[in-house]
């Protein structure tokens, strides 16, 4: 984080603006809107500055900038076209520990002025730190279109009434969520139809807020937070409680609503930190207490995630539930490794297989060893030797290509590859969570490996290893 986002209360605070042109004029409008006591210093001023001065809205000081003008000022903005003047303003402000913004000069700036969406009392600031101004502008435009003009004012007017009407914090939050996502209310505000808007508000106050809890099963995807679905993001930002496991990345957890309770039930193959039965009970108890619970699972909750078992338990007690699918590890890891799971010349089908089946004969190895298909083993590291032995024993060529993807789709992704006869050895080079991909499609990785070929200064390089038969 290059800049600490902060909102300043500038009402009746003395601020200095150096510059009298059109750019300075835009900065002056912002300071005046914030209620600041504005002094403008320049050799020449636009007519608008003279108009403001005549109206008593700001003060003008004609002449060259001198450091003494900074006395008793809270902040200063330099908006001249003279680099030497801007540099002097910045240097003088720095010496006096006064925040200074030099327009279009990030190196001589101790604070930045973001794009602003004003829905007072709701204020939204968007900034790229000067590195992507077009992106910041596009985001502002989208937010401007998304938020009705009078929404913030309506929320401010209702605040005290909501506080009195709903004594429980969770009830207040749910009321606000309903109000702020009410499409017809938003349309009424956009149309300036305040009578209709008031009717929608009254309906929300009179509608019962159920105390009945619910559970939403959300797939967090394989690691990269950008692969979390929009609906998944909405759910984790509305949750009272988030129950999550170790396969959910820190980047995804950073998107969870800050005041939501977080319950870690991490587990891994062969070692259950929290027994499945206890996880079921946690979900049940939290929902029965009237909370909105998100069960957040890595990948997709219905693919080797035991999501079905958890929902069966909830269904038995009549707890409402829903499911938000996620990108499963097989899809994410293969895509980020440049390995297509199907290909007309290599594989006409793909099989997702659990790698820690413990009962002898549980897997149909003869079928798995068939040609023209791709195998993806989940949780298979500890059984890599068994997988290698069984597939070769049932007819799969020992030279079949394999790849192991560790921490797939994350910046720490590692891929090791080789032949089936080396699988047990390769498994010792990676750690969990890892995915095993078996099939001739792995040979396409060298051609299609887009992710590790990208070099980012702020990201560790993705590691690629290839084992060769001696």
UniProtKB/Swiss-Prot annotation:
Source superkingdom: Bacteria
GO molecular function, one term: NAD binding
Any single biological process term in GO: siroheme biosynthetic process
Listed pathway(s): Cofactor biosynthesis; adenosylcobalamin biosynthesis; precorrin-2 from uroporphyrinogen III: step 1/1; Cofactor biosynthesis; adenosylcobalamin biosynthesis; sirohydrochlorin from precorrin-2: step 1/1; Porphyrin-containing compound metabolism; siroheme biosynthesis; precorrin-2 from uroporphyrinogen III: step 1/1; Porphyrin-containing compound metabolism; siroheme biosynthesis; siroheme from sirohydrochlorin: step 1/1
Residues involved in NAD(+) binding: 22-23, 43-44
InterPro entries xref list: 4pyrrol_Mease, 4pyrrol_Methylase_sf, 4pyrrole_Mease_sub1, 4pyrrole_Mease_sub2, CobA/CysG_C, NAD(P)-bd_dom_sf, Siro_Cobalamin_biosynth, Sirohaem_synt_dimer_dom_sf
Region (Uroporphyrinogen-III C-methyltransferase): 213-470
Region (Precorrin-2 dehydrogenase /sirohydrochlorin ferrochelatase): 1-201
Positions of the catalytic residues: 245, 267
Residues bearing PTM Phosphoserine: 128
Function comment: Then it catalyzes the NAD-dependent ring dehydrogenation of precorrin-2 to yield sirohydrochlorin. Finally, it catalyzes the ferrochelation of sirohydrochlorin to yield siroheme.
Family statement drawn from the similarity comment of this UniProt entry: In the N-terminal section; belongs to the precorrin-2 dehydrogenase / sirohydrochlorin ferrochelatase family.
The name this protein goes by in its record: Siroheme synthase
Alphabetized PROSITE patterns for the sequence: SUMT_1, SUMT_2
Protein EC: 2.1.1.107, 1.3.1.76, 4.99.1.4
Catalytic activity field: uroporphyrinogen III + 2 S-adenosyl-L-methionine = precorrin-2 + 2 S-adenosyl-L-homocysteine + H(+); precorrin-2 + NAD(+) = sirohydrochlorin + NADH + 2 H(+); siroheme + 2 H(+) = sirohydrochlorin + Fe(2+)
Organism of this sequence: Yersinia pestis
Binding sites annotated in the UniProt record for S-adenosyl-L-methionine: 222, 298-300, 303, 328-329, 379, 408
Keyword terms, alphabetized: Cobalamin biosynthesis, Lyase, Methyltransferase, Multifunctional enzyme, NAD, Oxidoreductase, Phosphoprotein, Porphyrin biosynthesis, S-adenosyl-L-methionine, Transferase
């Amino acid at each position: 984080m290059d800049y600490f986002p902060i909102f300043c209360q500038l009402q009746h605070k003395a601020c200095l603006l150096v510059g009298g042109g059109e750019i300075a004029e835009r900065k002056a409008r912002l300071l005046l809107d914030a209620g600041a006591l504005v002094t403008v210093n320049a050799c020449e001023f636009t007519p608008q500055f003279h108009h403001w001065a005549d109206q008593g809205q700001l003060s003008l000081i004609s002449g060259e900038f001198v450091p003494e003008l900074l006395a008793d000022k809270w902040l200063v903005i330099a908006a001249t076209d003279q680099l030497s003047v801007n540099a002097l303003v910045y240097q003088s402000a720095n010496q006096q520990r006064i925040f200074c913004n030099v327009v279009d000069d990030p190196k001589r700036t101790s604070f930045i002025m973001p794009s602003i969406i004003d829905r007072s009392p709701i204020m939204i600031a968007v900034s790229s730190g000067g590195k992507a101004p077009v992106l910041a502008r596009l985001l502002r435009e989208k937010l401007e279109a998304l938020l009705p003009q009078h929404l913030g004012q309506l929320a401010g007017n209702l605040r005290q009434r909501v506080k009195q009407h709903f004594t429980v914090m969770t009830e207040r939050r749910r009321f606000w969520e309903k109000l702020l996502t009410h499409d017809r209310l938003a349309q009424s505000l956009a149309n300036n139809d305040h009578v209709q808007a008031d009717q929608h508000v009254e309906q929300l106050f009179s509608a019962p807020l159920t105390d009945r809890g619910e559970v939403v099963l959300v797939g967090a995807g394989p690691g990269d937070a950008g692969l979390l679905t929009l609906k998944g993001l909405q759910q984790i930002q509305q949750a009272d409680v988030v129950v999550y496991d170790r396969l959910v990345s820190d980047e995804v957890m950073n998107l969870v609503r800050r005041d939501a309770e977080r319950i870690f039930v991490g587990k891994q193959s062969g070692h259950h930190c929290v027994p499945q039965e206890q996880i079921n009970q946690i979900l049940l108890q939290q929902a029965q207490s009237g909370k909105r619970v998100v069960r957040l699972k890595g990948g997709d909750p219905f693919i080797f995630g035991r999501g079905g078992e958890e929902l069966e338990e909830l269904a038995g007690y009549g707890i409402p539930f829903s499911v938000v699918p996620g990108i499963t590890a097989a899809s994410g890891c293969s895509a980020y490794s440049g390995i297509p799971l199907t290909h007309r010349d290599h594989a006409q089908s793909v099989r997702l297989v659990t790698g820690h089946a413990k009962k002898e004969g549980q897997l149909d190895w003869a079928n798995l060893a068939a040609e023209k298909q791709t195998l993806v083993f989940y949780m298979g590291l500890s059984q890599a030797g068994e997988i290698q032995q069984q597939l070769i024993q049932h007819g799969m060529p020992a030279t079949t290509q394999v790849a192991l993807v560790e921490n797939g789709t994350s910046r720490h992704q590692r891929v090791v590859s080789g032949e089936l006869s080396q699988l047990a050895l390769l498994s010792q080079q990676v750690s969990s969570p890892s995915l095993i991909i078996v099939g001739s499609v792995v040979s396409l990785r060298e051609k299609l490996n887009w992710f590790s070929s990208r070099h980012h200064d702020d990201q560790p390089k993705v590691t690629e290893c290839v084992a060769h038969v001696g």
